[in-house]
Amino acid sequence: MLAAVMDYFRSCWGPRSPAGHRVRGSDVAGRQDGLLWYKDAGQLVTGEFSMAVVQANNLLEDQSQVESGALSMAEPGPQGTFIGVYDGHGGPETARFINDHMFHHLRRFATEHKCMSTDVIRKAFQATEEGFLSLVSKQWSLKPQIAAVGSCCLVGVICSGTLYVANLGDSRAVLGRFVKSTGEVVATQLSSEHNACYEEVRQELQASHPDDPQIVVLKHNVWRVKGLIQISRSIGDVYLKRPEYNREPLHSKFRLRETFKRPILSSEPAIAVHQIQPNDHFVIFASDGLWEHLSNQEAVDLVQNNPRNGIARRLVKVAMQEAAKKREMRYSDLKKIDRGVRRHFHDDITVIVVFLDSNAISKANWSRGPSVSLRGGGVTLPANSLAPFSTPTVLSSTY
């Protein structure tokens, strides 16, 4: 029985090679310490990386992946690195779905186009959204709550000396760039955010829905789309995109009183294209759980002023220390709080730091390098779980 359980955990979180084979070994797959999962250091075809995930929700709603090597199915084809951070809400289903499908779609479209481009990335987002909509359609009658599950989606692709950053929601990618004149490493945000707390997002929503004075509502001092959700773009959240799912048997707290004729939320990603320069040192990809507690420059300073090995774990720790400070409690006490209850203090946090090696990036264009396929981990519960069901306990851990 124990062997079967361990096989299940390995199947959920073990890394795969591009051919689909699992790579065994705790160092390769990352390590678990209480609610913290981490991979302190690893080598990509474009440089080094560090990765960490800490769980706060009863069900881990953050999903993440690092893929490095072939970016298409063609031989020869473009080589590079793919980063994905998927911050789910309402449950883990959408984020898990993106983790299973986004990179596959990207490789498929890169094969068709014979290159990497914004069109390839946009089509991968669209195919992932359509795939999840199809899943909702199949499961709606038995599991209507799945229509109210969604995810932010942050993707980074490094290929042929270019960094593409595509985003839906409020995860963030921040570049650390060395400024020769001052000797400082300065933070530059590469991603656009889609959260109603920003005036420009509210204006965009109002322009798209001029006949709806309640398209954004200030509720308990927080701006929300239709009074329900803070983000304006996502994968999933079908109940705010297709009116046929905004009805019974969906729970009444998600249903709008009035019907709608066009989607309220969008799945169109904002895509930035950045030509990598020698003074571009690293990029921090993280869910909003990190950015709630650290500014862009604070995060960049931490990466710049500390060893690469374990830097993602260090960022998570500093964010948790800030969360504890805000609640006037000790970090050591916060670590003892189990998933579920922990969400009252901080969100799930995912951090992936990618160091940009100009030499490796130039060599990786079409030549084979080390292949990496890794997914962020956590305390896993059954894949079909929609609702928390365990009693929180006190944990002991060393991070």
UniProtKB/Swiss-Prot annotation:
Co-factor(s): Mg(2+); Mn(2+)
Domain PPM-type phosphatase intervals: 48-356
Residues noted as binding Mn(2+) 1 in the record, renumbered to the chain: 87-88
Binding-site positions, Mn(2+) 2: 87, 288, 347
PROSITE patterns assigned: PPM_1, PPM_2
Superkingdom field: Eukaryota
This enzyme's EC code(s): 3.1.3.16
Broad enzyme group: hydrolase
Gene Ontology biological process terms in this record: regulation of intracellular signal transduction
Keyword annotations from UniProtKB, A to Z: Hydrolase, Magnesium, Manganese, Metal-binding, Protein phosphatase
Record-linked CDD domains: PP2Cc (cd00143)
One Pfam family it belongs to: PP2C
Cofactor note: Binds 2 magnesium or manganese ions per subunit.
One function term, GO molecular function aspect: protein serine/threonine phosphatase activity
Record-linked InterPro entries: PP2C, PP2C_BS, PPM-type-like_dom_sf, PPM-type_phosphatase-like_dom
Gene3D superfamilies attached to this UniProt entry: PPM-type phosphatase domain (3.60.40.10)
Catalytic activity line of the entry: O-phospho-L-seryl-[protein] + H2O = L-seryl-[protein] + phosphate; O-phospho-L-threonyl-[protein] + H2O = L-threonyl-[protein] + phosphate
Family note: Belongs to the PP2C family.
Protein name: Probable protein phosphatase 2C 28
Protein source organism: Oryza sativa subsp. japonica
Source taxonomy: Eukaryota, Viridiplantae, Streptophyta, Embryophyta, Tracheophyta
